[in-house]
């Protein structure tokens, strides 16, 4: 749709080319409805929710360009995290269920051949450790599901999560991406924070944006407000440099590009730690099972 608008086509022609129900849309337009309300009606995609907010403050073409930029950039971090974390979680679950299988099915049948409890004790300790970690992982997954699907829960828990440096970095990156995209659309700083305060779909960004905008309405200086917000410390440095240089857009872009690299590095370290731990436990399991499998042979040698 954006490509057609860039070619100078009128709205009616673009609607006829892009939508199956063009007649209904055109009829609703003739009845006085706003195009953006028609397009976003019943839509659940994040792009349309962003577009609906932006269209109130800029032209439809500008809003579409800005919404696409925000949507594409903000998806990068989440996609990287969830795609990278999936394999370590699989390895962890595989190791856990292997331990359960051997400790519940294989080991009891081998107990008759052994008087040594050391190997069994080690396996029991592994089972307890993995069970505790598995319960923690399930709880975290449930909390993540609630965080994504229950807006009220997300809104309540954000202030507590911001005490975590990794989450703080993640939210600050999202905020800087959106702010940079809005400033690049030639909006004033106050208008940008007003838009961010209306981004209810992005509760994290809304939390920051609404707080800043409300304090701006009270007459406080932006430089003072920024220092009171729990942003990533590096962001505060870049933001102040950008304000002094009068080129905040470029500085913000430099910041979030560096911050994304830092976030990916942290995620990769977490992934490597999980993989090493899971592989190590699988290795211990193999050694224990190997020792147990040798027990009947050892008994034959003693006869």
What residue spans do the PLM features occupy?
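Juxtamembrane/interface alpha-helical elements of multi-pass membrane proteins
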Residues: 1-29, 127-216, 267, 271-278
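Intracellular alpha-helical coupling/juxtamembrane segments of multi-pass membrane proteins
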Residues: 4-7, 67-81, 166-172, 182, ...
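Short, well-structured alpha-helical segments that form the helix of a local strand-helix-strand
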Residues: 14-16, 36-40, 63, 67, ...
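Short, non-transmembrane cytosolic segments of multipass membrane proteins
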Residues: 22-59, 214-244
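Cytoplasmic juxtamembrane interface segments
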Residues: 23-33, 58-82, 197, 204-220
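Cytosolic juxtamembrane regions of integral membrane proteins
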Residues: 37-86, 242, 250, 257
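Bilayer-spanning, highly hydrophobic alpha-helical transmembrane segments
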Residues: 73-146, 261-303
């Amino acid at each position: 749709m954006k490509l057609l608008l860039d070619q100078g086509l009128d709205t009616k022609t673009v609607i006829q080319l892009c939508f199956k129900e063009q007649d209904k849309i055109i009829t609703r337009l003739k009845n006085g409805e706003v195009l953006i309300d028609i397009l976003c009606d019943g839509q659940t995609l994040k792009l349309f929710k962003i577009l609906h907010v932006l269209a109130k403050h800029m032209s439809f073409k500008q809003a579409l360009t800005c919404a696409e930029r925000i949507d594409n950039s903000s998806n990068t971090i989440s996609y990287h995290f969830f795609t990278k974390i999936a394999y370590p979680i699989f390895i962890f679950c595989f190791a856990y269920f292997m331990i359960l299988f051997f400790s519940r099915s294989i080991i009891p049948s081998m107990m008759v051949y052994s008087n040594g409890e050391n190997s069994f004790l080690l396996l029991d300790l592994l089972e307890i450790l993995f069970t505790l970690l598995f319960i923690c992982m399930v709880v975290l997954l449930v909390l993540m599901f609630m965080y994504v699907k229950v807006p009220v829960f997300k809104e309540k828990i954000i202030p507590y999560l911001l005490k975590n440096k990794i989450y703080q970095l993640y939210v600050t990156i999202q905020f800087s991406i959106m702010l940079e995209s809005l400033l690049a659309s030639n909006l004033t700083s106050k208008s940008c924070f007003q838009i961010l305060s209306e981004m209810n779909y992005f509760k994290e960004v809304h939390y920051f944006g609404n707080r800043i905008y409300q304090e701006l309405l009270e007459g406080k200086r932006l430089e003072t407000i920024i220092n009171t917000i729990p942003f990533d410390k590096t962001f505060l440095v870049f933001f102040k440099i950008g304000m002094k240089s009068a080129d905040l857009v470029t500085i913000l872009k430099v910041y979030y590009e560096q911050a994304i690299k830092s976030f990916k590095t942290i995620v990769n370290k977490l992934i490597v730690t999980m993989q090493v731990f899971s592989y190590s436990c699988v290795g211990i399991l193999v050694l224990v099972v190997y020792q147990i499998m040798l027990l009947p042979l050892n008994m034959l040698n003693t006869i």
